[in-house]
Each structure stands twice: as C-alpha cells, then as structure tokens.
A protein has these predicted regions:
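Multi-pass alpha-helical transmembrane bundle typical of ion/small-solute transporters
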Residues: 2-213
Length: 213
C-alpha cells in the first residue's frame, strides 16, 4: 500500500470513528433527558414514573429511528474505498441532524399532544434522511469510483431508499403544521412498509446481478 493510500485509509477511518462517536453521544443524550425528581419517596415513585410515559415513548421512537440512521450510515460507509472531502462534508451535514435528534425528541416528549413539536420532530428526521441521500449521491458519483463501481439503476434505487423516509417525514411535518396531528402520527406506521418494499426490490436486483455475474 502506497503512503498516499495509507493516509487516505487513516482519514477514512477517522471519519467513520467520529461518526460512530456522534451517534453514541446522541443516543446517550436521548436517555439523559429522562429524569425523575430528585426528592421522591416509595409511595410516589410509580406515579412519578407514569408522568414520564410520554418521554419514554419519545425515547423509544427516537432510539429506533437513530438506530435506523446508524444502520443506513453503516451500510453506505462500509462501501467507501478511499477518503473524499465532498463526502466528508456531506457526512458532517448528516451528523448535524443526528445531533439535533435529542433536542427534537425532548421537545416532542414534553409536548406530545401538540402539533408544532411533532412537526419539528419530523423535520429533524426528514433532514437526516435527505442529507444521507445527498451523501450517497456525492459518494456514488463518477460511476461509483469511490465505492467500487455502481450501475445507474442500482444507484437510483439506493437514492430512492435513502430519500423515502424523508418523504414520509416531510409529509408528517406538513400534516402536523396543518393541524392534522393524527394523520401526522400515521407517518410512523407508513415508514415500515415503504422501507420493506424498497428492501425487497433491492434484494431482487442484487440477486439478479449476482446471477448475471
């Protein structure tokens, strides 16, 4: 391995390690926002816990979504063969939305029945989705020279997979700010079938490509 290639590999590893650290910190902050009062006794602890139910619900939803973003980020960066500054800048933009997730989750958990906090929550997650789409668009440019090559059809499918959650969340934000809070909540249930359908299509294309090879 040449000296330049070794330096590129170290920089790529640092980018990925930094990203994992940001995810770990964001997940820690999600739990750190759930606090009981400092002075409680045995007779009131369960009633106090009950008042935290919205925060726990927000934490569980946010943990699931943060795990989704980490898995998507892992899937994308594992294909990178060399360090690239445009990709790194897009990665930082993606991490900006991950860092904002604990703030959005805490706001949502404290005001779960209000429209605006839910809209804000969906906007942050839509930002994560669209910024990841931008990152993959940049890192797969030039025929995928940074990731070992990629066809136009597969690239389009991967970009659609990355952007699909953002479209669902943007729709949820629109409904939340329009006052249709129950339609906005329905967006969380839309996400799973959309991702599953795109995953099935991606699997079929990969098997077809493997047979052709």
């Amino acid at each position: 391995m040449s000296e330049d290639a070794s330096a590129d590999r170290r920089m790529l590893d640092r980018m990925i390690f930094f990203s994992d650290a940001v995810f770990a910190f964001a997940l820690l902050l999600l739990a750190a926002d759930i606090r009981l009062p400092t002075s409680i006794d045995d007779s009131t602890i369960w009633s106090q816990m009950a008042t935290l139910a919205p925060h726990f619900a927000s934490f569980l939803i946010s943990f699931a979504l943060a795990s989704l973003w980490w898995a998507v980020h892992l899937s994308a960066t594992r294909e990178l063969r060399t360090f690239d500054w445009p990709t790194t800048l897009c990665n930082l933009f993606f991490l900006l939305w991950i860092v904002l997730l604990p703030f959005a989750a805490d706001t949502f958990g404290a005001n779960m029945m209000a429209d605006a906090p839910l809209g804000l929550y969906w906007i942050v997650n839509a930002g994560a989705s669209f910024s990841m789409t931008l990152m993959f668009f940049v890192m797969s440019r030039g025929g995928g020279r940074l990731i070992g090559g990629i066809g136009a059809g597969e690239r389009l499918l991967r970009l659609t997979q990355a952007a699909a959650p953002g479209a669902v969340f943007a729709l949820g934000a629109y409904w939340a700010f329009s006052g249709d809070i129950w339609l906005s909540r329905f967006c969380a249930m839309l996400l799973a079938p959309v991702m599953m359908a795109l995953g099935v299509i991606a699997g079929m294309l990969k098997r077809r490509r493997a047979k052709a090879a």
